[in-house]
């Protein structure tokens, strides 16, 4: 473990430079926005009614929980963040937020997210939120990320749980429907993350994070991306076959899945500048957003009232 952690010099911390924007960046707003959206869709698809105010509290708690995990992740990864071009402008690395302050912010934010989820929503949703934060920090960030080539696969559990939390916030249950939502994100995560690793391979090698391209090579990684893309295509159609979404969902999600497979296949003909990997990565974000937008707009049941 110690060989993977390199000392960094953040310089003198100037608290006067810290802004609200820095604290928002500390919570990984791009990741958090997707978490909020998938969590909301999970709530919408639950075949029960909930007061909009309670639904709003649940969404805020999910957002704060995701933000707390992101902040603690940045605290723990501040050494490797300073080595990667993609992460060198994060608040702790830039020296505008002190590392201990970031940790405290993350812990306090996470505590209130879990507490108010339990107080205002239900205990199951609160437990799932707590488990998600714990899993992302302890299982993925601390244990797997710097040790295992399967870091993204196993660690993807935490990123796939927000719709399950949202569903539980309304229904107080875990169902087949919410499990399928989980599977869609869980299977989507590896090809999405490995595409990023393909064009950030040098960064991951430099900070000794064992991402698949750095350990197994690009050809092996592309084969794995294609396998997971095929699995994703199959799983993404399941909401129609269990009656959760209508025929429009089946058609459009099928088309989106075919395009996903096309981009996965195009990786085998990529250029040295990783142009296809970048395109696949960008499309994968669009794909997940649009799939969940479809899940929301073509569902066969209504909930929040």
Swiss-Prot record:
Pathways involved: Porphyrin-containing compound metabolism; heme O biosynthesis; heme O from protoheme: step 1/1
Membrane topology note: Multi-pass membrane protein
Organism domain of life: Bacteria
GO molecular function: protoheme IX farnesyltransferase activity
Entries under NCBIfam families matching the protein: cyoE_ctaB (TIGR01473), PRK04375.1-2 (NF003349)
Note: Carbon 2 of the heme B porphyrin ring is defined according to the Fischer nomenclature.
Family of the protein in this entry: Belongs to the UbiA prenyltransferase family. Protoheme IX farnesyltransferase subfamily.
Protein name: Protoheme IX farnesyltransferase
Organism: Rickettsia peacockii (strain Rustic)
Gene: ctaB
């Amino acid at each position: 473990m110690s060989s993977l952690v390199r000392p960094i010099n953040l310089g003198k911390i100037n608290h006067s430079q810290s802004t609200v924007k820095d604290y928002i960046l500390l919570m990984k707003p791009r990741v958090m926005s997707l978490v909020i959206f998938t969590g909301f869709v999970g709530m919408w698809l639950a075949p029960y009614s909930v007061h909009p105010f309670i639904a709003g509290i649940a969404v805020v708690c999910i957002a704060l929980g995701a933000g707390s995990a992101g902040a603690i992740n940045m605290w723990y990864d501040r050494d490797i963040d300073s080595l990667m071009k993609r992460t060198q402008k994060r608040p702790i690395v830039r020296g505008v937020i002190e590392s201990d302050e970031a940790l405290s912010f993350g812990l306090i934010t996470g505590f209130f997210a879990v507490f108010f989820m339990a107080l205002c929503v239900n205990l199951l949703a609160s437990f799932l939120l707590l488990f998600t934060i714990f899993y992302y920090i302890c299982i993925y960030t601390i244990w797997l990320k710097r040790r295992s080539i399967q870091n993204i696969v196993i660690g993807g559990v935490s990123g796939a749980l927000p719709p399950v939390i949202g569903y539980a916030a309304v229904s107080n249950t875990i169902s087949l429907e919410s499990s399928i939502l989980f599977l869609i994100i869980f299977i989507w995560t590896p090809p999405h993350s490995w595409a990023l690793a393909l064009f950030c391979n040098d960064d991951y090698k430099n900070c000794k994070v064992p991402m698949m391209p750095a350990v197994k090579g690009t050809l092996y990684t592309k084969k794995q991306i294609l396998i997971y893309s095929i699995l994703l295509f199959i799983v993404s159609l399941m909401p129609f076959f269990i009656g959760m979404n209508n025929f429009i969902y089946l058609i459009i999600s099928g088309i989106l899945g075919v395009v996903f497979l096309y981009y996965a296949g195009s990786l085998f003909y990529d250029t040295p500048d990783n142009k296809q990997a970048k395109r696949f990565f960008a499309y994968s974000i669009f794909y997940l957003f649009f799939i969940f937008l479809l899940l929301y707009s073509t569902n066969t049941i209504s909930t929040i009232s």
